[in-house]
Structure formats: structure tokens, C-alpha cells
């Protein structure tokens, strides 16, 4: 399989996304984006058991330190972020060090935030090992940790030096996490590319069988969609990048109310996508057939299309206001005018939203 490359260029800071097989064995590739002689690999207990030793071997001629997190969203906290910084300082890492995030979205987010803050900013490389991280979390430079009040409330924009996607890491990904990652691919299609959405409908059976040929193509397309949006609006100033939050205001509220880690992020995103589509239909933006197609595709993937019965409308609405997509005390929701065409809207007031959440 030929390795595919997607080039990102944010504020004249270009970096590549590589997508292929056996990339974790490519010494030249993995050393190419390290400018100094120090690296620290951050991973979690689950991923480290599979991939840490081979990656450490690549850097055997470097000062190579490691920090291993427990596995789970509940550990994406200021406490563990501080532990990473302490390890960097205690091992005497300098400004030319490089952090390597080996893992899923939690590892990538907390490692990137540590890199953004250590000595006012050092390099880091994303090596995402979950489908969700490969198509979304590793791309675009958003780094953060969670706070009891809300998800990703504390963080920074800090672009990686490279994103290295080894498809072989998907062989060890549990089925539930693999399917959760599909939610972000569906989201990318809904935002910008109706043809891509149709392709997903036609190829989903092969994708769920982890066919690498098809997976490489859809990961590349999802990465291109995010690349184009991030290049145009790195820090959500123009509103373009806000489109990537389709379904996420609902999703983040669901995650917080259930307790981080009870639902995977992609599972909450799936329910959020359906809520956004249903609200779009209610406001006469999205036709019923398109809404049905979204629900059918997510159901085929075995992802949730309803938010949990244990959460009531008042709780969900209150939690949504702790999201970052609030401006001038109004929720800015991402809605769909069509498959492949998302828009930012502040035209949903609390009364309408509460009625929608209570009655659908």
C-alpha cells in the first residue's frame, strides 16, 4: 500500500499527515520531524503494551523518556497534565525536545497541551492509534484537558509537527472504539461533502470489516475536510471552524452528565449528530429523507441515535451552556441545511430548545 499524505498549512506552519501501513516501523519517517536529541513518548497503559517498545527502539540513540497514563477520558485532567510537565522537568528536557503522543484522543489532547505549555511551547508529534483520533482529534492543533464543569475547558491551540497514522494500529482497536470513530467520519461528510456521505453509505460494510484500502481512502478524505477548515480558520474566528462542532454541543453535555468515560466520545457525537439533524428538520432546514439517511447510517454502525433516558431536558440544556460554543449568552448550534452543508445558527432560543429536547 502506498502511503498517502495530506498537507496542512496553518498560519504558515506546514505539517504533513501520513496515512499508511507499518509506519511505526519507519525509522526515517519517525526521526525526520524531531529536531533535537530528546523525546518523551506519552501513551496509556493499553496502547503502550502493544506499541511502546517498538517506538522506543526507533529513538534508542536519543534521550527517550516515557510517561504512561491510565486509560480513559476521566484521566484527561489538570492533575495528569501536571504530572507530564513534572516528568519533562525532572528529566531535564530542553526547548528542543519533542513530545510524541502515542494513543487516542485523550493522549493526543493532554500531550499537546503539555507541549504547548512546557517552556512556553515545544514540538510534538501525533501518532494516533484510534480511528477517532486519526480522523479528528489529532488534526488541527486543539489541545485541552477536561474540568468538572465542562469538557475541554482548559487548553490551547498548538499545531503538531506531524501526524503519523499507521493503519495497523486499528487491528488492536476494540470494536466499540472503532465504531465510535466512525461517528467523526460521518460528521465530516455531513459538514462538507454529500458525495462522501453517499460513499460511506455504499462502503460501510467493507469499512466495518476494517478493509485497509477503503479505510485509507475515508481517513484521507476526512482529514482533507478538516484540513481545509482548519487552514481557513485555525482559532474559530470566522465561524468556519465552528462547523466541526456539528453534534458536539449536545455530545459534550451528554458526556459530562453521564460521567466522562461512560459513553465514548464518538457515541455521544453520534447521538449529537442525530439531535442536530432532528432540530434542523424541525426548523425546516433539513428534509425528512436526509434525516432518515443519517439515522440509518449511524444505526448500521451500531451507534446510539438517542440521548440517554437518564438525562432530562433541563439537565441537558444547562450542561450545553457550559460548552465553548456560547457567545453573548446564546448557544451557537451547528445545523444542517442539507447533507454536506452545515451552518452556524444562534436562532434557537431556550424555550424552543427545551421543547425540542422534551418532545423531539
Swiss-Prot record:
A GO BP annotation: chorismate biosynthetic process
GO cellular component, one term: cytoplasm
Gene3D superfamilies: 3.40.50.1970, Dehydroquinate synthase-like - alpha domain (1.20.1090.10)
Organism expressing this protein natively: Coxiella burnetii (strain RSA 493 / Nine Mile phase I)
InterPro entries: Dehydroquinate_synthase, DHQ_synth_AroB, DHQ_synth_fam, DHQS/DOIS_N, DHQS_C
Top-level taxon: Bacteria
High-level lineage: Bacteria, Pseudomonadati, Pseudomonadota, Gammaproteobacteria, Legionellales
Family indicated by similarity: Belongs to the sugar phosphate cyclases superfamily. Dehydroquinate synthase family.
Reported cofactor(s): NAD(+); Co(2+); Zn(2+)
Name this polypeptide is given: 3-dehydroquinate synthase
Gene expressing this chain: aroB
Cofactor note: Binds 1 divalent metal cation per subunit. Can use either Co(2+) or Zn(2+).
Location within or outside the cell: Cytoplasm
CDD domains to which the protein is assigned, alphabetical: DHQS
